[in-house]
Structure formats: C-alpha cells, structure tokens
C-alpha cells in the first residue's frame, strides 16, 4: 500500500509535552490518519552500550531485536493511557496510525506507546 502523508493532522506545541500531532478536521473512528515508512535499526544501534541517546526517545520495538523510527509524523504522536488513535505494523517497513474513536478538529491525536490502546504498561517518563 502507498504511504500517506496526512492532510488530516499537523504538528504543533502540546502543553507540557513539547510537540504533538493535532487534528486539522474532524476524524471519524476507523479512519487511517497516515501510513508511514519506518527506518529499521538493530537494537544495539539505538541503545548501544553507553548512555541513552536522543534517538532512543523516538524509537519503538520492531520485533525481538530491532527498533524502528517512524517517518512522517509517526514519531511525534504523544503517549496517552486513554488514546484516540492506535498504530500497527503494515508490512515489513510501514506503520499505520488510525483513529479508534471520533477525534474533533483541534484535538491532540495520541496513541498508547505499548501498542495496545487499553494497556497500562508503565513508561519511562511522566505522562502529562
């Protein structure tokens, strides 16, 4: 499937979170917000043996020994334990972000970094 750079969202400042992804229009539940390519890296290149790198803040698990960086807005969606969107792998090197409920224009689009929308797995930062 082709990659989609979304016209439904934009990146702007998110209160207490740095940047975030926000809806430019109402988005209906089930809508694919964007389909993006991912850059796949060996786990050791992201985390190495030294201190945590800035790159690690944007990477997510891609199988047992790999990490991925999502292109497009993919690495800019903020985490929420009550997300309005989800992400999932779409082929060997693509990621999809889709609405799991209706999202209002101007609302921040968030995902659960665990990959499961209802998961309560702890994250390594304070959730705003």
List where the protein language model places each region:
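Conserved catalytic SET/PR domain of SAM-dependent protein methyltransferases, capturing the structural core
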Residues: 1-128
């Amino acid at each position: 499937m082709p990659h989609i750079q979304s016209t439904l969202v934009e990146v702007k400042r998110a209160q207490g979170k740095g940047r975030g992804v926000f809806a430019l229009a109402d988005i209906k539940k089930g809508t694919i917000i964007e389909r993006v390519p991912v850059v796949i890296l060996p786990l050791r290149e992201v985390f190495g043996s030294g201190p945590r790198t800035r790159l690690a803040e944007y990477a997510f698990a891609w199988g047992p020994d790999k990490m991925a960086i999502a292109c497009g807005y993919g690495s800019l969606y903020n985490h929420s334990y009550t997300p309005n969107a989800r992400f999932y792998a779409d082929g060997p090197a693509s990621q999809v972000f889709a609405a799991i409920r209706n999202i209002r224009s101007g609302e921040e689009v968030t995902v659960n970094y665990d990959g499961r929308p209802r998961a309560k797995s702890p994250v390594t930062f304070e959730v705003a």
